[in-house]
A protein has these predicted regions:
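Transmembrane-embedded, aromatic-rich helix segments that form part
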Residues: 192-204
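Membrane-interface transmembrane helices that cradle and orient dolichyl/undecaprenyl
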Residues: 113, 117, 156-175, 203-214, ...
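Transmembrane-helix motifs of polytopic, lipid-linked glycan transferases
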Residues: 13, 80-112, 155-159
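Transmembrane signal-anchor helices characteristic of membrane glycosylation enzymes that use polyprenol
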Residues: 5-33, 130-132, 190, 230-233
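Aromatic- and kink-enriched transmembrane "portal" helix at the membrane-lumen/periplasm boundary
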Residues: 24, 71-79, 104-119, 123-150, ...
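Short hydrophobic alpha-helices at membrane interfaces in multi-pass membrane enzymes
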Residues: 121-124, 159, 166-184, 213-225
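Extracytoplasmic catalytic/substrate-binding loops of multi-pass membrane glycan-assembly enzymes
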Residues: 27-39, 49-61, 76
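Start-transfer (signal-anchor) and selected internal transmembrane alpha helices
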Residues: 1-22, 88, 110-124, 267-281
Length: 281
């Protein structure tokens, strides 16, 4: 198994290197003629893009833009962020494919050379096929949110597979907390990453329960409901509730502007810290 892990890591990084070279070589050198110009200029000046916004993408884009020699190089640096995000997506896709292959072929713990080649080969073929697919390659070479969103999608799903490997060990819930954190960050890029929630919910169900048709259907409904709650309530209502707090603190209590926002932020942080301490994570 140690030999498989070593080869799995080496092959994964080789696939990452191939995809990185391809995307950087074929990368757009300026702004493509659609939303990319908006995102690149907004990242450079930390401004606001069209609704619903992409604050985390813009902050990362701003960091990349700092490496530009002058303003004419900003687009290249933001586009390179998409290229690197996409190549990391390919890396985690490779490891996801090999993780499934390992569960299929290595059930008894014996790793035959033919099966080892088959699993690694499946990972290479699958990940490189996606590398050169039209839609993904298109988004990988320009300053748009879809490349970074794909990265978070691949990363969160890979994390649930890592959790599944150690689910029976102490403190395995740390992986679930990490997934929640990444999902929160991905909301600041694009909402597409939330679509991994039902799939991760099914993996959680299969790991902790004996399969039944009713149980699988119930798990699917619950995980889909979590997606709807995040999408329909938590995301839109959090900012609204923050504004309500600020209005009460300013109008009713006579406190300075943004005092309600600060209180709301401290309240949320306190609840998170309490939850971490209570669960001993």
């Amino acid at each position: 198994m140690n030999n498989f892990k070593k080869l799995n890591n080496i092959t994964g990084w080789l696939v990452f290197l191939i995809s990185t070279i391809i995307y950087l070589v074929t990368m757009e050198k300026t702004a493509s003629l659609w939303d990319c110009g908006e995102f690149i200029s907004a990242a450079y000046k930390l401004e606001v893009v069209h609704a619903p916004g992409a604050p985390f993408f813009l902050m990362l884009g701003r960091i990349f833009s700092l490496f530009a020699a002058d303003a004419s190089q900003v687009a290249i640096m933001v586009n390179s962020m998409s290229a690197l995000s996409s190549s990391f997506t390919i890396l985690f896709l490779f490891w996801t494919i090999t993780a499934f292959g390992r569960k299929i072929y290595f059930k008894d713990g014996n790793i035959e050379q033919s099966k080892l080649i088959a699993v690694l080969g499946a990972g290479v073929v699958g990940s490189l096929s996606y590398t050169f697919s039209d839609s993904f390659w298109f988004s990988a070479v320009e300053g748009e949110v879809y490349a970074l969103s794909s990265f978070f999608t691949a990363l969160t799903f890979w994390c649930i597979l890592k959790w599944e490997e150690v689910a029976d060990s102490p403190h395995s819930s740390k992986w679930l907390v990490l997934i929640a954190y990444f999902i929160g960050l991905s909301i600041g890029v694009h909402l597409l990453s939330l679509l991994t929630i039902p799939a991760m919910g099914m993996i959680y169900y299969f790991k902790n329960n004996k399969y039944t048709h009713y149980g699988a259907f119930k798990a699917l409904i619950i995980s889909a409901s979590i997606l709807l709650v995040i999408q329909g309530i938590i995301i839109p209502k959090t900012a609204s509730l923050m504004g309500t707090f600020d209005r009460i603190f300013v109008n009713d209590f006579g406190l300075p502007f943004n005092s309600g926002v600060l209180f709301f932020f401290l309240l949320i942080m306190s609840l998170i810290i309490y939850g971490l301490v209570k669960t001993k994570l």
